[in-house]
Amino acid sequence: MATTAAAAAAALSAAATAKTGRKNHQRHHVLPARGRVGAAAVRCSAVSPVTPPSPAPPATPLRPWGPAEPRKGADILVEALERCGVSDVFAYPGGASMEIHQALTRSPVITNHLFRHEQGEAFAASGYARASGRVGVCVATSGPGATNLVSALADALLDSVPMVAITGQVPRRMIGTDAFQETPIVEVTRSITKHNYLVLDVEDIPRVIQEAFFLASSGRPGPVLVDIPKDIQQQMAVPVWDTSMNLPGYIARLPKPPATELLEQVLRLVGESRRPILYVGGGCSASGDELRWFVELTGIPVTTTLMGLGNFPSDDPLSLRMLGMHGTVYANYAVDKADLLLAFGVRFDDRVTGKIEAFASRAKIVHIDIDPAEIGKNKQPHVSICADVKLALQGLNALLQQSTTKTSSDFSAWHNELDQQKREFPLGYKTFGEEIPPQYAIQVLDELTKGEAIIATGVGQHQMWAAQYYTYKRPRQWLSSAGLGAMGFGLPAAAGASVANPGVTVVDIDGDGSFLMNIQELALIRIENLPVKVMVLNNQHLGMVVQWEDRFYKANRAHTYLGNPECESEIYPDFVTIAKGFNIPAVRVTKKSEVRAAIKKMLETPGPYLLDIIVPHQEHVLPMIPSGGAFKDMILDGDGRTVY
């Protein structure tokens, strides 16, 4: 991962031309597209990147030292980030991280995006990583700044998101003295990170950063935290860039390419099956092309988890869309009736399986995953392969193409059976006059963007409707807190995705409860003029909890109304007025007939925009398999207007 000094110097020199002269290193314009990992940029609206004026050359060099001259530890840290390919960080300053921010102002490469809360910046780093495949980097000060990262780190661990979080710490001599803003963040985050470091020697910084990025992005991706005391940041040293990583045990345990014999065994099971199903998760986010080719060669229908949305196109005839608690009837039917379950890049999460004993009870199970800890953890497979799913699919496809026999079994009867389920049990909802069904609003958004926008969500009913009613066509198009279920994720994640995909329309489909948790990040999308559209499905309630109250608690309301109890007829808080306070255009709609024109205007307006859509709180997300239930327990109708 380390580059030669000459190559690094050349890269930094080229990048410096683009960055030199930016004040405070914050972008105040829509950025021109640059190379990235992932799908090609798609513009869903009239928004076009604005090319900034050419900056004047600096009066003095940003870094007035030579390669062999000493510099502060904070500058070594920033140079190490540059050598790992970092161009964007999400950092909020404080006393213990000031040196890092000062060093960032001397970087010719890295831009800082100043979110207004550390949780917001960390969710933005997650959105950046999810939407690009690159490592997201966030920086916070010690104490409360560091602890504000906790939810985002836990979220990244559960959803396998590559992140590096860097925290300032009190000076080494003060550690353990309960100094001002001292928190043992390494201990706090030990169980919610893939690995973490406390740097006690300035000379370790190049190696530690190199290792942190390797750990975050290799194997099963995840978050890594690096805690750096302030005196280490201030200490002068000459960096040694050719230091090798010291991870012998970890590297030795990384999965190897799958054995041909195991892949042949999988294909034999495919050949023997009559009702196979592919169960695809977030572990396939880097192997969309290989997955589509495998499906083309075999004709096996595909269902995805919440994390797997987009890894196989939702509009493909062989797509069964999402399975699980709020998955389609036909996806859950297919898993229940299947004789072979190919589980690729999944972890048999409880929201997918329900009653684990009843899940795929008729099927032989093949589980391929890069994390050995997931194999057999929840459901025992008949065949297991611990490997990168991308390599496994490449191997399977090669074997299928080499075969002299017919590569595609005749699953036509199975296809017809599932097509009948699709016709009999489509996703649907009821309409009540001019009330706006939230599902309808998402369908209109899908139609007007042609299913090409990047979608971020908060957590709740709106999240499930966005999963059900938007058409995801490619990996990294869907961004949501799946494992942790962290409200407040949507807006900052959308902003991070926009940074990673300049000029591309990103829509945060949010609920009023989730949106309010990180509403302050409207400031960032306005200041940087990011084309982030916020579409709030506002029912004045904590909708998913209300749904459970309706179904399982005799509709007894227990602190789930989020409006003003003294005047329930008003919309409270007034998101339109709040957005305008951030200088963001905003509109509220209350009638179904207004929705299409309002969404069209939102998409056509350059820069950020907020659309507040008032929806009924009685709507339920359906289908629904109750927690711990099985396919036979699926609920297909009813809402909050019904007495149970």
Curated annotation (Swiss-Prot):
It catalyses: 2 pyruvate + H(+) = (2S)-2-acetolactate + CO2. Changing residue 390 to E: In strain: cv. Strawhull; resistant to imidazolinone and sulfonylurea herbicides. Changing residue 293 to R: In strain: cv. Bengal and cv. Strawhull. Its cofactor is Mg(2+); thiamine diphosphate. The keyword Nucleotide-binding does not apply. InterPro entries: Acetolactate_synth_lsu, AHAS_TPP, DHS-like_NAD/FAD-binding_dom, THDP-binding, Thiamin_PyroP_enz_cen_dom, Thiamin_PyroP_enz_TPP-bd_dom, TPP_enz, TPP_enzyme_TPP-bd. Thiamine diphosphate binds at residue 118. One of its GO terms (cellular component) is acetolactate synthase complex. FAD binds at residues 220, 326-347, 369-388. Its EC number is 2.2.1.6. Pathway: Amino-acid biosynthesis; L-isoleucine biosynthesis; L-isoleucine from 2-oxobutanoate: step 1/4; Amino-acid biosynthesis; L-valine biosynthesis; L-valine from pyruvate: step 1/4. GO terms for biological process: isoleucine biosynthetic process; L-valine biosynthetic process; response to herbicide. Residues 1-43 form a transit peptide. It is found in: Plastid, Chloroplast. Residues 47-67 are annotated as: Disordered. One of its GO terms (molecular function) is acetolactate synthase activity. Residues 50-61 have a biased composition (Pro residues). The keyword Glycoprotein does not apply. Belongs to the TPP enzyme family. NCBIfam families: acolac_lg. Acetolactate synthase is the target enzyme for sulfonylurea and imidazolinone herbicides. This is Acetolactate synthase 1, chloroplastic. The gene is ALS1.
